Amino acid sequence: MSKNSKAYKAALEKIDAGRIYAPIDAMKTVKETAYSSYDPTVDVAIRLGVDPRKADQLVRGTVSLPNGTGKEVRVVVFAEGPNATAAEEAGADVVGTAELVERIQGGWTDFDAAIATPDQMAKVGRVARVLGPRGLMPNPKTGTVTTDVTKAVKEIKGGKISFRVDKAANLHAVLGKASFSAEQLAENYGALIDELLRVKPSAAKGRYLKKVTVSCTNGPAVPVDNTVVKNYTGEAE
């Protein structure tokens, strides 16, 4: 919604100016700011205390959100033979090899995640310039280049998300839908924060979680207390 719209201003009024919310309170508040005829997505934006220009301070990885994302995730798999059959049985939306590459070369990118078996990566490389900028390129580090396609498909369909810090040291991720309970959103938030702390670069100095906000699609940002790194569903003391 436009920041000048009545709906946006009404949503903004529900956020206490100057308050930094405990995670559970932030989730309750962000649900109150939802204003839409559809079920908007709840996103988190995190400013990290890292220098992404340095290779030893890149932050990226995956995490399985305990309550899923609430979104129907479309998954494509580059595989053939038994692996292709396994991918289809696991629920992959599109499975293929050369023909899938050609389809993507033709401009098709109507999917949310891509998985490939190692033997197909040479073919996938032909569309790296299409998939890479969109964050869709299969990568061993995120578990999307694998021989266990069944596990990979089920994890992504079940709520596994990828995250990566951008050039400005910001990281964005989905936490769920506004229809989720505040507890479900806080649990998903906690899973992400726990994983971010686990993969914190040893070279990072100073405060790691510098700023955290949550918001619904096109809605105002709710500040989250970045010092809370446990008991995410607990009320502020």
Curated annotation (Swiss-Prot):
<dbReference type="GO" id="GO:0000049">
    <property type="term" value="F:tRNA binding"/>
</dbReference>
<dbReference type="Pfam" id="PF00687">
    <property type="entry name" value="Ribosomal_L1"/>
</dbReference>
<comment type="function">
    <text>Protein L1 is also a translational repressor protein, it controls the translation of the L11 operon by binding to its mRNA.</text>
</comment>
<dbReference type="InterPro" id="IPR005878">
    <property type="entry name" value="Ribosom_uL1_bac-type"/>
</dbReference>
<keyword id="KW-0699">rRNA-binding</keyword>
<keyword id="KW-0689">Ribosomal protein</keyword>
<comment type="subunit">
    <text>Part of the 50S ribosomal subunit.</text>
</comment>
<dbReference type="InterPro" id="IPR016095">
    <property type="entry name" value="Ribosomal_uL1_3-a/b-sand"/>
</dbReference>
<protein>
    <recommendedName>
        <fullName>Large ribosomal subunit protein uL1</fullName>
    </recommendedName>
</protein>
<dbReference type="GO" id="GO:0015934">
    <property type="term" value="C:large ribosomal subunit"/>
</dbReference>
<dbReference type="GO" id="GO:0006417">
    <property type="term" value="P:regulation of translation"/>
</dbReference>
<dbReference type="InterPro" id="IPR028364">
    <property type="entry name" value="Ribosomal_uL1/biogenesis"/>
</dbReference>
<comment type="function">
    <text>Binds directly to 23S rRNA. The L1 stalk is quite mobile in the ribosome, and is involved in E site tRNA release.</text>
</comment>
<keyword id="KW-0678">Repressor</keyword>
<keyword id="KW-0820">tRNA-binding</keyword>
<dbReference type="GO" id="GO:0006412">
    <property type="term" value="P:translation"/>
</dbReference>
<dbReference type="GO" id="GO:0019843">
    <property type="term" value="F:rRNA binding"/>
</dbReference>
<keyword id="KW-0694">RNA-binding</keyword>
<dbReference type="InterPro" id="IPR002143">
    <property type="entry name" value="Ribosomal_uL1"/>
</dbReference>
<comment type="similarity">
    <text>Belongs to the universal ribosomal protein uL1 family.</text>
</comment>
<dbReference type="InterPro" id="IPR023674">
    <property type="entry name" value="Ribosomal_uL1-like"/>
</dbReference>
<dbReference type="InterPro" id="IPR023673">
    <property type="entry name" value="Ribosomal_uL1_CS"/>
</dbReference>
<dbReference type="GO" id="GO:0003735">
    <property type="term" value="F:structural constituent of ribosome"/>
</dbReference>
<keyword id="KW-0810">Translation regulation</keyword>
<keyword id="KW-0687">Ribonucleoprotein</keyword>
